[in-house]
Amino acid sequence: HVQVVNKPQFLKSDGLEGLPVQIIALPWVSRSGLMASLELSGEDPGKVYEELENRLSDLVKNWLDDADPNLPMILTAHASVEGAKYGSERMVMLGKDLVLPPALVKNKRLDYVALGHIHKPQNLNEGSHPPAIYPGSIERVDFGEINDKKYYILAEITKGKTDVTWKE
């Protein structure tokens, strides 16, 4: 099953053809678009980023409160997370990213967190639940990644427990 979203959404089981799972989907959010939609244009940039991050955190918290406690909950996010380690792609990124707080991706009500945007493979919640994983990019963006191993993830997700296998 594949579903593409262009704005933050909470996808419940009935919207996923009855699949026994719930997904909070956070696609790449452009700062300028989000600022305009939240009527924050012209504000101090530091204040704007803080407000955007707070509003996104509140949105996710509200969706978690509305979730079915009996079904697994997955968070997918194309975003940076505070504390994540960047690979060589950092050199090609311009501007300040919208940054998610670590507490958001380590929330125990989540069963798996699938992250994209940062190319360095890493689990931001190593040894704890939920796994919060950047598998890295399967494509190299420049010669700085020529010797980097590339991975994908197999995740067996059940409510309260997720088994993750890194595949090269």
Name every feature range the model reports, one short phrase each.
Residues 1-168:
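Extended recognition/assembly regions associated with phosphoester-bond processing machinery
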